[in-house]
Regions:
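Bacterial N-terminal signal peptides that target proteins for export
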Residues: 2-12
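Short, internal strand/loop/helix patches
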Residues: 112-160
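Bacterial N-terminal signal peptides
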Residues: 11-22
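Thiol-based oxidoreductase modules, predominantly thioredoxin-like and allied folds used
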Residues: 93-106, 121-130
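Short active-site neighborhood of thiol/selenol oxidoreductases, capturing the structured segment around
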Residues: 53-74, 80
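Thiol-/selenol-based redox modules, centered on thioredoxin-like
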Residues: 149-199
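N-terminal "domain-start" segment that seeds a small globular fold
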Residues: 26-56, 78
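Conserved helix-turn-beta segment immediately C-terminal to the redox Cys motif
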Residues: 58-59, 75-99
């Protein structure tokens, strides 16, 4: 009997270790993250010029996607919206950006009808193909268009689905991979807000 209990304890410790490693690896603290990101100028969902530097002093959350995305984008934007709602008064210290990787279809008008569905505090951004490509490269976002036929508006875009967290100085703090539970994202954001409050 004691042998069985000992084996169960070992199995339990192994599972606990696995879960710990998994939770610690969920947030990317890559040594190269200081080389990811940077300022940019795009067009917001109201058709106005938008510069990242105008958000200095705030924590900035950035997600890249597109309005025709069938699954990942709605899921992540819903999670992001829940995070913003859960922050209460601290939400005013955070700005959330949705940058389109499909500028051909995602016009400002298209974004204007899309982003408020998730949150009134979400800013939709688009631009020319060269502008979007430059920002995607700076943030190391991978994109690939699939099944696009000539003159067709129906196609899919594969893209990286990380959530980028920028500090009040515009520098990269965290790169959160797709699939992290909303509660974990919220905790990361709260931790960064607490750090911001101490500055």
């Amino acid at each position: 009997m004691s042998k069985i209990l000992k084996q169960l304890k070992i199995v339990g410790l192994v599972l606990l270790l696995a879960l710990t490693l998994q939770s610690n690896s969920a947030i990317v603290y890559a040594g190269e993250k200081s080389n990811v990101g940077g300022d940019f100028t795009l067009t917001d969902h109201n058709g106005k010029k938008f510069e990242l530097q105008q958000l200095r002093g705030k924590l900035v959350l950035i997600f890249f996607g597109y309005t025709f995305c069938p699954d990942i984008c709605p899921t992540e934007l819903s999670s992001l919206a829940k995070v913003l709602r859960s922050l209460g008064d601290d939400a005013e210290k955070v700005s959330a950006l949705f940058i389109s990787v499909d500028p051909e279809r995602d016009t400002p008008d298209k974004l204007k009808n899309y982003v408020p569905f998730f949150s009134p505090n979400l800013i939709g951004l688009t631009g020319s193909e060269s502008e979007i490509s430059a920002v995607a490269d700076a943030y190391r976002v991978q994109t690939k268009i699939h099944s696009k036929k000539k003159d067709s508006e129906y196609y899919l875009v594969d893209h990286s689905a990380n959530l980028y967290v920028l500090g009040a100085d515009g520098k990269m703090l965290n790169i959160i991979p797709f699939g992290l539970p909303t509660e974990h994202i919220l905790q990361v954001v709260k931790n960064e807000i607490n750090h911001l409050n101490k500055l």
